[in-house]
Amino acid sequence: MGDLSEADSMKHQLQRRDCGRCGLGQICDAGACRPSTMM
């Protein structure tokens, strides 16, 4: 577990909001839903 920078945190929130259709623990990559392997 590393320290999340302010920018990374904001980016993550934007990704989550942009991909609300994705399930929890998933990330949006190029408009596609992918399981988040980084935790």
UniProtKB/Swiss-Prot annotation:
Alphabetic keyword roster: Disulfide bond, Neurotoxin, Secreted, Toxin
GO cellular component: extracellular region
One example GO MF annotation: toxin activity
Stated name of the protein: Conotoxin Cl14.7
Compartments it resides in: Secreted
Organism: Californiconus californicus (California cone)
Domain of life the protein comes from: Eukaryota
Record text about domains: The cysteine framework is XIV (C-C-C-C).
Tissue: Expressed by the venom duct.
Post-translational modifications: Contains 2 disulfide bonds.
